[in-house]
């Protein structure tokens, strides 16, 4: 089981990298919006399928607002676990005594922020519409990636951090709900190419799988110590 989990992480990493390269290189055509600054039409990879789906899924302000505001709720999980960590620090007065899964979460959040910043600089393609009088980086869908990473990590970490079963169940239901609503509404909003959503799912799946490996290792160590 342990070996299979690590292999799955590697497979997902390779899939995310290969897919990103393919998006940047395969079937790249100028089907995106015109750059207001240069007057040049932006190019997009997998243009045939992206163009087909974009024509079916025009911009929908309702789904856009849903993905935007429900996405904000995901940061409630970050605040929740940060609060638990702070409470543990106040009680135990020793950083080393804080639950190691909380530390793993903190490091994971930093990694997510780094990946987010990386793709803001490394522009693979631009959004299918101009929303702020300028082209915006579109790959991967940051809302998709953040929702899956934040909510998915909560699902994995809650069993080690939240001892109250009822609260844990509520957290997990909320995590699944927010994650699904954001991903689906982001696709239906029409503010991303189809491959942006897929890329976001692949990248975040690798990150969540790897985080899960870390959590399982911590849990095993804690069980052995007890």
Regions found by a protein language model. Give the residues of each.
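Hydrophobic alpha-helical transmembrane segments of polytopic
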Residues: 12, 70-77, 109, 113, ...
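Membrane-embedded catalytic cores of phosphoryl/pyrophosphoryl-handling enzymes
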Residues: 4-7, 128-226
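Aromatic-anchored segments of alpha-helical transmembrane domains
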Residues: 17-21, 112-115, 177-187
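Membrane-interface loops
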Residues: 28-39, 83-171
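Hydrophobic, lipid-facing residues on alpha-helical transmembrane segments of integral membrane proteins
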Residues: 14, 18, 103-118, 149, ...
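Hydrophobic, aromatic-rich alpha-helical transmembrane segments
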Residues: 2, 6, 62-65, 98, ...
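Membrane-helix interface/capping segments
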Residues: 57-59, 63-66, 79-95
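N-terminal transmembrane-helix/juxtamembrane module of multi-pass inner/ER membrane proteins
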Residues: 2-77, 120-131
């Amino acid at each position: 089981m342990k070996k299979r989990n690590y292999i799955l992480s590697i497979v997902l990493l390779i899939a995310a990298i290969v897919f990103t390269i393919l998006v940047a290189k395969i079937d790249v055509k100028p089907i995106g919006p015109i750059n207001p600054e240069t007057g040049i039409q932006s190019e997009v990879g997998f243009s045939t399928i992206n163009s087909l789906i974009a024509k079916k899924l025009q911009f929908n302000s309702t789904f856009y607002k849903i993905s935007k505001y429900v996405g904000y709720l995901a940061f409630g999980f970050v605040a929740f676990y940060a609060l638990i960590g702070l409470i543990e620090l106040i009680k135990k007065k020793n950083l080393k005594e804080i639950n190691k899964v909380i530390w793993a979460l903190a490091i994971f959040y930093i990694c997510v922020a780094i990946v987010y910043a990386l793709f803001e600089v490394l522009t693979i393609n631009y959004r299918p519409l101009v929303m702020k009088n300028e082209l915006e980086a579109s790959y991967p869908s940051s809302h998709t990636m953040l929702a899956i990473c934040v909510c998915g990590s909560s699902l994995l970490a809650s069993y080690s951090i939240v001892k109250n079963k009822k609260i844990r169940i509520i957290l997990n239901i909320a995590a699944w709900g927010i994650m699904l609503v954001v991903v689906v509404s982001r696709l239906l909003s029409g503010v991303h190419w189809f491959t942006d959503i897929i890329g976001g799912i692949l990248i975040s799946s690798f990150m969540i799988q790897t985080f899960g490996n870390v959590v399982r290792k911590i849990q095993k160590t804690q069980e052995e110590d007890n």
